[in-house]
Amino acid sequence: MAFEFRLPDIGEGIHEGEIVKWFIKAGDTIEEDDVLAEVQNDKSVVEIPSPVSGTVEEVLVDEGTVAVVGDVIVKIDAPDAEEMQFKGHGDDEDSKKEEKEQESPVQEEASSTQSQEKTEVDESKTVKAMPSVRKYARENGVNIKAVNGSGKNGRITKEDIDAYLNGGSSEEGSNTSAASESTSSDVVNASATQALPEGDFPETTEKIPAMRKAIAKAMVNSKHTAPHVTLMDEIDVQELWDHRKKFKEIAAEQGTKLTFLPYVVKALVSALKKYPALNTSFNEEAGEVVHKHYWNIGIAADTDKGLLVPVVKHADRKSIFEISDEINELAVKARDGKLTSEEMKGATCTISNIGSAGGQWFTPVINHPEVAILGIGRIAQKPIVKDGEIVAAPVLALSLSFDHRQIDGATGQNAMNHIKRLLNNPELLLMEG
């Protein structure tokens, strides 16, 4: 009887996902832990490994189709496979039993280990492990996020759990895995630089990566849904420049890398409060406008895999230093591919910084269902008129795109003027921000 593999709960709050790519087809022979597919949810792409070895009988879900946790997505001829169930499908009773087991003496023996983990474990760490391994970790009182994986691509196995219980952390295995990843990456890079085909107009093709598909879908949806208007302006930021310079060393003393971006975040939040139409969502189908009484700012981040938008939540409650620290932490996570889906949810307005790439004015695309996005360009020395004289000053380029269904031109410009006023005199951020 064929083993029916169901889409598992991968432990990141994902209840459904789009099958963006299959790595197997009917007739393929696979080994346990081989990657079966890539699943997309929001902007996170997760590899789904096989829990068994065998032969693929049938792929039941096509690429581009959304599957729900518990749906059978592939059948595998695996005669020696044990009966397996996955979190999210038919294991409610097991979950209840596990909760009771966690109060047993076995758990008490591991309590001292767990107490140490709590102060050291990175709870935002992305874990690669099969549901059976996660269950095994729970049964043995192990926080799986404290375990280093020795499997393919850093995947955690039962042996890693055993090694952890015996006082090890599988670091050697993890290093081996990292080396393996590096080697495989070199192979991919080598293949990518293979000789071009012959002819006067050589062309090569590649499949669109899952991340690029997600970005393309979001951009097209935004442009097709919201009539965009973009206002472009600039502002003398000499006082902002001096203010950052004054507090840069103080920030560094407490481990904070102070940039101009946190000032822009605070100025934008102030504008959203003063002009709340920019902090809404426009639901034309339902005939509703959703007013958001919280201020979460998305920060568009350029990564090797594509555009990601981590979110600074409750930015109105945080200081310049706190926002700076959070932006830097999220940027590192974005570059390392360690952002969780939760860290990319809930933005009410977004900032796109093309200035970091040397750009100036542009037409940023709204991060739908938001209704506005603020683009910031580079700060450049320009001649300006001050007190009747032409002087050189650092000037910041700003671009504000908004959904014209919800925001009128005058409202958009008034919001832009408010942002300019605060950035021109950063002390006002303390008074009004």
Curated annotation (Swiss-Prot):
- Enumerate the residue ranges of region (Disordered): 80-134, 164-204
Q: Where is the composition biased (Basic and acidic residues)?
A: 84-103, 117-126
Query: What's its catalytic activity?
Result: N(6)-[(R)-dihydrolipoyl]-L-lysyl-[protein] + acetyl-CoA = N(6)-[(R)-S(8)-acetyldihydrolipoyl]-L-lysyl-[protein] + CoA
Positions bearing N6-lipoyllysine:
K43
Q: Has UniProt tagged this entry with the keyword Transcription?
A: no
State the organism named in the record.
Answer: Staphylococcus epidermidis (strain ATCC 35984 / DSM 28319 / BCRC 17069 / CCUG 31568 / BM 3577 / RP62A)
- Give the quaternary structure: Forms a 24-polypeptide structural core with octahedral symmetry.
Keyword Cell membrane in the entry? The reply is no
- The entry's protein name is Dihydrolipoyllysine-residue acetyltransferase component of pyruvate dehydrogenase complex
| GO cellular component: a single term | cytoplasm
**Which Pfam family, an example, fits this chain?**
Biotin_lipoyl
